[in-house]
């Protein structure tokens, strides 16, 4: 058996990437767009608060989202970007207190969500059974990405997110190839060993192997 994880899988790696709605300002309920054509019961524009969002940033129909047709809401994962934007980027200043920040905050949230998703996959890759060279590169880009998430709103908005994602995807591909190479090698070696064991006990002379 080959273990694809080289390092101990530490859940603490992902603590900051887990949803904590209590520390958020209902940003997913504001920033995201959805429509009836996508299976939702109503249309909602990006940057406009959902009609179900309450003044305390809680959902008034949270316990009946599925029944009311808001299935997408129950499946959405912001990877902890909501509380990051609320508590770190804007230091607790919400869009209800400062309506002029609503559009900017929504834009920052959508970018932050992408960055946090990248961090999730990078941290997943960092514990895989990969080469030390790739592991070092992944650790460096994790550090770089975390620094970006701590930047101010304007810097985050001006970030070349496509360029950064390209760098991340390249490393994730390298990590995947590294793991798959070891898995294929293990399977090949195991198969050969099993074939040798079988050959000692089976006489295939004259057998029809078509």
Predicted feature locations:
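Terminal amphipathic alpha-helical/low-complexity segments used for targeting or macromolecular assembly
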Residues: 69-191
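N-terminal, Lys/Arg-enriched amphipathic/low-complexity engagement segments
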Residues: 1-26, 36
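Tandem repeat scaffolds
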Residues: 184-210
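Local cysteine-cluster metal-coordination motifs and their immediate loop/turn environment
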Residues: 18-35, 48-80, 106-113, 120
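Membrane-interface helix-loop junction between the first two transmembrane segments
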Residues: 37-44
């Amino acid at each position: 058996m080959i273990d694809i994880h080289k390092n101990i899988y530490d859940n603490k790696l992902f603590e900051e990437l887990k949803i904590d709605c209590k520390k958020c300002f209902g940003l997913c309920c504001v920033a995201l767009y959805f429509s009836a054509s996508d299976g939702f019961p109503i249309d909602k524009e990006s940057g406009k608060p959902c009609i179900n969002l309450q003044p305390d940033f809680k959902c008034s129909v949270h316990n009946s989202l599925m029944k009311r047709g808001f299935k997408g809401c129950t499946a959405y994962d912001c990877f902890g970007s909501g509380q990051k934007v609320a508590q770190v980027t804007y230091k607790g200043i919400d869009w209800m207190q400062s309506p002029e920040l609503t559009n900017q905050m929504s834009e920052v949230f959508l970018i932050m969500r992408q960055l946090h998703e990248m961090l999730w996959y990078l941290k997943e890759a960092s514990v895989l059974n990969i080469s030390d060279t790739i592991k070092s590169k992944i650790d460096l880009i994790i550090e770089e990405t975390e620094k970006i998430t701590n930047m101010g709103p304007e810097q985050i908005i001006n970030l070349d997110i496509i360029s950064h994602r390209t760098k991340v995807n390249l490393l994730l591909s390298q990590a995947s190839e590294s793991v798959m190479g070891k898995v294929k090698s293990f399977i090949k070696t195991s198969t050969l060993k099993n074939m040798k064991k079988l050959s000692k006990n089976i006489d295939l002379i004259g057998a029809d192997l078509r």
